[in-house]
């Protein structure tokens, strides 16, 4: 009984913390092969443990805050697609931007994509899966990378998009800053592709 009470207390404390920090999201590591139809993908993803009921919100205050993971690539990796789950899009229309940044030995990082990788979603009260295929060829050489997402723009009376919450070490880059700020949860954004041997 005591263990149950402690567990509930921890969950309540975590959800209170998450509610205060709900702008912050995402996570990923190279994982096992995923088979989609006849196509095989290596997944650059680690969603972490799903938090029941809890959600992460992107809204007006989170615009231009990048939220993502630091990923180690031991071999060249060709990115094929991104996927994520959205619980509800309360905005009439929301535009998101994905970023790939190479992290140098001194901690500095630069955007790798010449063309911004954007995707949009329209207002919906239903849970939906989104898949994004980049037009630009994205091949990551061995090294350390930051992969993140930000809300670029939203329209409508309630400019908010809600995602499922996962427990996972992630990082935030504030607007006009280069510092990687650690946070403890994400939305489970997946990056799939293939290792180049």
Which residues fall in each region the model found?
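A short, structured loop/turn motif at beta-sheet edges
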Residues: 104-107, 135-144
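Beta-sheet-rich sandwich/jelly-roll-like modules and their strand-loop junctions
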Residues: 24-103, 144, 150-197
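Positively charged n-region of N-terminal signal peptides that target proteins for export
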Residues: 1-4
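Exposed aromatic-hydrophobic patches
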Residues: 126-137
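Solvent-exposed serine/threonine-rich low-complexity stretches and specific carbohydrate-binding patches
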Residues: 111-123
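Boundary at the C-terminal end of the N-terminal hydrophobic targeting segment
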Residues: 18-22
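Bacterial N-terminal signal peptides
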Residues: 7-13
């Amino acid at each position: 009984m005591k263990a149950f009470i402690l567990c509930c207390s921890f969950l309540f404390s975590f959800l209170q913390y998450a509610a205060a920090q709900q702008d912050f999201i995402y996570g990923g590591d190279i994982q096992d092969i995923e088979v989609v139809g006849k196509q095989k993908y290596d997944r650059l993803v680690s969603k972490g443990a799903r938090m029941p009921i809890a959600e992460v919100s992107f809204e007006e205050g989170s615009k231009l805050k990048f939220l993502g993971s630091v990923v180690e690539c031991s071999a060249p990796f060709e990115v094929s697609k991104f996927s994520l789950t959205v619980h509800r899009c309360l905005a009439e229309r929301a535009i998101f931007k994905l970023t790939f940044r190479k992290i140098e030995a001194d901690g500095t990082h630069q955007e790798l994509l010449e063309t911004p990788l954007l995707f949009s979603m329209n207002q919906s009260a239903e849970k939906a899966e989104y898949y994004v295929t980049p037009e630009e060829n994205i091949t990551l050489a061995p090294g350390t990378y930051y992969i993140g997402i930000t809300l670029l723009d939203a329209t409508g009376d309630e400019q908010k998009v809600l995602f499922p919450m996962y427990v996972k070490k992630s990082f935030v880059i504030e607007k006009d800053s280069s510092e990687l700020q650690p946070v403890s949860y994400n939305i489970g954004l997946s990056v799939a592709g293939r290792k180049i041997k």
